[in-house]
Amino acid sequence: MTKTIAINAGSSSLKWQLYLMPEEKVLAKGLIERIGLKDSISTVKFDGCSEQQILDIENHTQAVKILLDDLIRFDIIKAYDEITGVGHRVVAGGEYFKESTVVEGDVLEKVEELSLLAPLHNPANAAGVRAFKELLPDITSVVVFDTSFHTSMPEKAYRYPLPTKYYTENKVRKYGAHGTSHQFVAGEAAKLLGRPLEDLKLITCHIGNGGSITAVKAGKSVDTSMGFTPLGGIMMGTRTGDIDPAIIPYLMQYTEDFNTPEDISRVLNRESGLLGVSANSSDMRDIEAAVAEGNHEASLAYEMYVDRIQKYIGQYLAVLNGADAIVFTAGVGENAENFRRDVISGISWFGCDVDDEKNVFGVTGDISTEAAKIRVLVIPTDEELVIARDVERLKK
């Protein structure tokens, strides 16, 4: 038995989960928030307990030290060397990383170079890797990429209709994201349906504050909604998703909001989506509450959100020539029953239908009516478990 920790480092946060492997038992999990700010918050959950403390945490290395010391303080481990492997979520692997990889040689430098593809994510992911390397230099360290699952896409799906030189020289193509989640729920869907994954055609919908939809055939990604960066695809909590590119130069010319690349990134990534249209919130719970109160902007935002998701599902039904199941996962996909009902009701003529008695908050599994030809599944994602499994596989 070994202890492996899965890490998801953000620019000011560190989410973690400690596993006993190969039993895949969660020993503890936690979240450190507001790194680099005053009054940082560290939360540790274990054995049904939850402990929280307010600290000043200056950087990721200090955050990792606090995490490890808490594991000892709460008697979850006796010493640092009980942890034999650490896996790090990294958003962008580009064309260079086609699978999870042990951190050695120039791997970390390559991860940092690929920050051009995920400027909001890769630098923070790399900071987490460096912090653990500094404190636990001798354990196996693995990077697990959101993009790896999508490297199976055919060229017709990942290329953009731009001059070829922008692909060959600048690597402009679709990379996708959330691959670890899509891979996990596809495997769980096969178990739930009692059929080999290789025989299935699935549409997996990872819908959280960020969101993406993937067409999965025989266990492989054949197309996905996110593009060159996680900005593409469906409308999201604060991101536009797909828009006409000509909007950008138009707004640069006629408004004061788009003067620099940073301005463009800020508006499209952080001020748009549900938040931008509703002028209220990026959180689906707030949007649904505002809709119930008759708020027009919130209602429009919700309708646009559902509409974009329905269109991508329809598109991928065409790509796959039908589907065996549509899978909902992540924060909104797992918990917003009205949202699931509304998405499916608009595409019911494809042969999918939701049973209202099964489609309730907190329920997972098959929520379809008996007569539905395409099953509708709710499956909680577990990206941390996939990361831990990859660490164990690569340690061998």
UniProtKB/Swiss-Prot annotation:
Substrate binds at residue 89. Mg(2+) binds at residues 8, 383. The record marks 178, 239 as: Transition state stabilizer. Keywords: ATP-binding, Cytoplasm, Kinase, Magnesium, Metal-binding, Nucleotide-binding, Transferase. Its main location: cytoplasm. The keyword Magnesium applies. The active site is at 146 (proton donor/acceptor). Its EC number is 2.7.2.1. It is an enzyme of class 2 (transferase). ATP binds at residues 15, 206-210, 283-285, 331-335. Mg(2+). Can also accept Mn(2+). GO terms for cellular component: cytoplasm. Catalyzes the formation of acetyl phosphate from acetate and ATP. Can also catalyze the reverse reaction. Homodimer. Belongs to the acetokinase family. This is Acetate kinase. It comes from Streptococcus pneumoniae (strain Hungary19A-6). The gene is ackA.
